[in-house]
């Protein structure tokens, strides 16, 4: 009888140990999956950040004022982004410039062989600030959501004026406007999650 009780106690202890080991293994797997999700999403965020930080728009506007008080003005873009985010940045700037006061939003999926796809929601505000929300395209319990924010430098335009220059020309004013983003104004943070009650 005592042997039966010991056998029963040993079985119960074994069941508890087996349950704890299974739970621990599941938790380790979930931690590994969450860590991999974070590494994938944060790598995508850093890749986008670095490309945008190397991008800029430079526009030059030349206003020629004549001696009869008339003037002409021409504008041209002398520099524009060339990296893999160039299409996003150009579309965002064009939309913001066209629809003054409205933000531009677009979503893409970033794919790299051997890694999970990352969904990125790009928003350019009317002041050219950029917010990109990134997460695993497949979602899931171990998903990691990060927010990349880049603030536009807000540099004043460079203005130079040359007087004279011709028989009918009074002065030529060149205004150079630069839109760019600085590492000092770039952050990557976890997205705040609001729980539903």
Task: Identify the role of each PLM range.
Residues 1-2, 50-197:
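Conserved functional hotspots that engage anionic ligands or polymers and/or phospholipid headgroups
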Residues 26-58:
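Membrane-proximal N-terminal amphipathic helix
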